[in-house]
Amino acid sequence: MALALEAARSWAASVLPPELAAAAGGDPLAALAATAAALVAGVVILAVWFRSGGGAPPKAAAPPPRPPPVKIEADADADDGRKRVTVFFGTQTGTAEGFAKAMAEEARARYEKAVFKVVDLDDYAAEDEEYEEKLRKETIVLLFLATYGDGEPTDNAARFYKWFTEGKEKEVWLKDLKYAVFGLGNRQYEHFNKVAKVVDELLEEQGGKRLVPVGLGDDDQCIEDDFTAWKEQVWPELDQLLRDEDDTTGASTPYTAAIPEYRIVFIDKSDVSFQDKSWSLANGSGVIDIHHPVRSNVAVRKELHKPASDRSCIHLEFDISGTGLVYETGDHVGVYSENAIETVEQAEKLLDLSPDTFFSVHADAEDGSPRKGGGSLAPPFPSPCTLRTALLRYADLLNSPKKAALVALAAHASDLAEAERLRFLASPAGKDEYSQWVVASQRSLLEVMAAFPSAKPPLGVFFAAVAPRLQPRYYSISSSPKMAPSRIHVTCALVYGPTPTGRIHQGVCSTWMKNAIPSEYSEECSWAPIYVRQSNFKLPADPTTPIIMIGPGTGLAPFRGFLQERLALKQSGVELGNSVLFFGCRNRNMDYIYEDELQNFIQEGALSELIVAFSREGPAKEYVQHKMTEKATEIWNIVSQGGYIYVCGDAKGMARDVHRALHTIVQEQGSLDSSKTESYVKSLQMDGRYLRDVW
């Protein structure tokens, strides 16, 4: 009954005109009308509720929800004299969104007379034409922008970034705008924080006034410290813009962020009105994306390495028939996998809770009002569910905890010494020790919790502030819809090895794939929510254009899709251009994956030349960049005649070495000086003829 009334209140509030809600504090007759309307709404919703079975959830549960479009208060855009700040975020894993919300929450405490609104860039404008109209009205903006992949924007920032960087010349049209940009990236990658840097520069070029230098958050170290340092630069600038001379709000009292916490409602599992949320093939939405994935069964799983190998590489096929999911050759698939059961059991012991604990998760208070610290809450995962389900599918348990998680653990540690130690590790004074003991040692969240056994956060805190949401893992699709229209193929190397603490780290998704049960062996097969992320890693529109593909190890994945595509075109009578594949592995008797298929592509004419580097066969290690040097003349002939170059694989090592080799080939074969060589290679990238799918 309580849940039904809560649903009635929520529904009534959403349909009543704003005047009625406001009338409760004004005209008694209007207040009576509002009350009557709410009661009628409640009766209607209660009738529907009980007729439908007492609130039992539908058979097909909703997938992980997308954050709703930004709700702006009725007076947020009114000209009431208050100064306004818009805080944008472009996020892939939720970190940028978390920083944006934390910044806004602290800013509201510091500047009570100002209005702050946090906006998902994807929700800012329904159509591209609206971007300019809306931006012209902004006066102060803060942007939190993550760089993803090979210098690309995140999914939710891609449309804005494309419009802002590729649109018509706008000249000086943002002269009334003041802005600050914080980037999130990893210094190990070539295009470190490219998106933030580009947006920061373009905003200035188009008339905006930069408040502070662009923040360069580095996830390879402690990105939270980078955010804190940048934030401390921003406050004095905002003080000048938002604080009156007589305004001392927040100036003397240090701000302490509230620890985010979901509202948890424990449910008697015997209540048949509630069922554990389950998945169906369709996701109930017309959209399939990171927030609306679809369930896909594992159809095929097989080991690609030979028995002599001490490593593992898995070929997996997802069955997408009946899901509405489509893909193109070269796209990526995002996979929401499960934690290993051993990992989950350890978490259950540390939380001291039964795996059958049944509960629902809510981001608001019982009366529907925002929770304390709720401004930084992510939308809750689907519930009700058991603790076992929540830990399996939604909790990131193996990454190193952020400092905010240590603060939350400290708040719920019964041992004072443990609480003090946790707070120290999260403090500026403990920066070096946190860097060594947590980050460099690759201590997982569960390892840290085991080291502080008195820290027992309630479930609402654990899922909101301690364990981040388990993120999808991305894989280059290794098939073509021309050959496999109802399947998505994945080629995945098993992540397995010791950490500095001696723990054997097993990759969450690769381990799940290694142990997956395919439908060809059992009706009780493994499955995962998946979605397709579009990529610009595509074959030339003209199939006669020559191509060079460079992909050692699992970097072969998208090129297997390319070659399937070319084979299908060949079989349909289409003329193909020259194609060369540089592949690398350790030993032909261990890890030469898809060897038979590659030979068949050559025999059928889909592949012109296959060049393989074996790094562990001869006296000297040989890699793909060495083979490129041997084929320098051939590579230059293809490139100089309009050919395309594709690279897939490790960004930190292989892709850098290949880039250097290409630079040398262009310089020597083209007889160019260093400056002209750099310009030539950059023009290949700008023209879309030098494409990289790297991680």
From Swiss-Prot:
Phylogenetic lineage: Eukaryota, Viridiplantae, Streptophyta, Embryophyta, Tracheophyta
Q: Which residue spans belong to the Lumenal compartment? A: 1-29
In the induction comment, the record states: Induced by drought stress, acifluorfen and cadmium. Induced by jasmonate (JA).
- List the protein's name: NADPH--cytochrome P450 reductase 1
Q: Which cofactor does it need?
A: FAD; FMN
Purpose:
This enzyme is required for electron transfer from NADP to cytochrome P450 in microsomes. It can also provide electron transfer to heme oxygenase and cytochrome B5. Can reduce cytochrome c in vitro.
Q: How is the cofactor bound?
A: Binds 1 FAD per monomer.
Database matches in PANTHER family? NADPH--CYTOCHROME P450 REDUCTASE 1, NITRIC OXIDE SYNTHASE-RELATED
Gene of this entry: CPR1
Which organism does this record belong to?
A: Oryza sativa subsp. japonica
| Domain annotation FAD-binding FR-type: ranges | 291-540
Query: Which reactions are catalysed by this chain?
Result: 2 oxidized [cytochrome P450] + NADPH = 2 reduced [cytochrome P450] + NADP(+) + H(+)
Provide the top EC class. oxidoreductase
User: What EC number(s) does this enzyme carry?
Assistant: 1.6.2.4
Give a Gene Ontology cellular component term annotated to this protein: endoplasmic reticulum membrane
Alphabetically, the GO molecular function entries are: flavin adenine dinucleotide binding; FMN binding; NADP binding; NADPH-hemoprotein reductase activity
In the record, the note on similarity to other proteins reads: Belongs to the NADPH--cytochrome P450 reductase family.
> Where is the protein situated, by its record's location annotation?
Endoplasmic reticulum membrane
Cytoplasmic membrane side: 51-695
- Which residues are FAD-binding? 473-476, 491-493, 507-510, 695
Q: What is its main location?
A: endoplasmic reticulum
Question: Keyword Flavoprotein on this protein?
Answer: yes
